């Protein structure tokens, strides 16, 4: 969220340079948008503060580094960043399943484009096998149709907030 605010400000500044006749409009728009992002940022801080967990575990790729860093969360993931890998090793699965057990995690996270197989395999290798598999949206696969139906950075991050609250219980 914090990087998104910086990017929005940079875009507005460049647009104002390109189109100085509407610079005030760009400035007003970015100010209003950043206020909404600040409100959402506060909700994220509150959710993390209220959560019982301070660690999230991804049975998937991990494009959420800025998110966990911004809110002081620890994390484990099957793959670093947005790796091209799609098959987790036995060692990775057993390590992550062990972390779920060790930390008493109630949720395993995955990305919106995941088929769920890695998260399910991790779950099936835990002692309790009762974790909920939740999906965070990285926005990497949003389409024009999604945007036309109302998807925006803020709406997706609001949905992700609800998922994160569940994961941190």
Protein language model features and the residues they cover:
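Extracytoplasmic metal-acquisition and chelation regions
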Residues: 1-169
